[in-house]
Amino acid sequence: MLQLRFMPGWVPRNGFFGLKETIGTVHKRFYALASEQPSRKTVKPLDSRKTFLIDTYKHLMENSSMIFFVHYNNLSKTEDHHFRFKIKQTGGKLTKVRNNLFEVYLRNSHLPDPCGFVKRKEQNWKHPLLPLLKGPTATITYEDTNPQQVAKLLKVLQSAQDKLMVIGAKVENEVLNVEKINTFKTLPTKPEMQSQLVSVLQMLSGLGLVRTLENSSNALYLTLKSHNDNQKPKEDVESTTDAESKGSK
């Protein structure tokens, strides 16, 4: 039996909250929970805003290859729209976050359900991203790892001055500070690096082939010479040996 209940602004998918459904021109926001599925045991009510936000941060972190943390300082509505558009042009998405709830997610991110009940000693209080959540914070997320997108993003944020300031990032499984981010933006893309690696491997394999052919030629020469010597009559071999010894004198 499927029970439906309308909600104020979000909808769960696969047990976790996701984006609202759009049907025609009407945005219907609802919550559906099947009795056949095991219910989640969360600290806050399943239909609460806090549970929704923690689920949102879980989705951002698990589905983004690159996530940048920025100070979001006193942007006007016009500036907010402007920079969201510029960031979107680089392939990214700007999301304002609530630090206290993002901290909950980070401390519990190693658990199956970050919204669930957990003892204090089981939480990760040394998560490397926790120090970044100081003051008004936003994230800029990218689905793929691409240093060129980072270079474009930093160029966009330069015009924002201190209103949008990068303070750190997580690129795949590595946490980067500002210095490492500036180094990362100069790297080639993955396809370029793969192409360079293929070229190096081809070069090395070519050198190996030359050496193999040289060694094979030398081995073949020695084998043929030995076989030829064995086929000669003993007298010829002795005379040849005497001639070689005289020549050496």
Swiss-Prot record:
InterPro entries assigned to the protein according to its UniProt record, in alphabetical order: Ribosomal_uL10, Ribosomal_uL10-like_sf, Ribosomal_uL10_bac_type
The organelle targeting sequence, given as a residue range: 1-31
PANTHER family cross-referenced by the UniProt entry: 39S RIBOSOMAL PROTEIN L10, MITOCHONDRIAL (PTHR11560)
Miscellaneous information on this protein: Present with 6000 molecules/cell in log phase SD medium.
GO cellular component, one term: mitochondrion
Species lineage: Eukaryota, Fungi, Dikarya, Ascomycota, Saccharomycotina
Top-level taxon of origin: Eukaryota
Pfam families with a match to the protein in the record: Ribosomal_L10
Name the record gives this protein: Large ribosomal subunit protein uL10m
Keywords associated with the record: Mitochondrion, Ribonucleoprotein, Ribosomal protein, Transit peptide
Record function comment: Component of the mitochondrial ribosome (mitoribosome), a dedicated translation machinery responsible for the synthesis of mitochondrial genome-encoded proteins, including at least some of the essential transmembrane subunits of the mitochondrial respiratory chain. The mitoribosomes are attached to the mitochondrial inner membrane and translation products are cotranslationally integrated into the membrane.
Compartment(s): Mitochondrion
One annotated GO molecular function: structural constituent of ribosome
Family: Belongs to the universal ribosomal protein uL10 family.
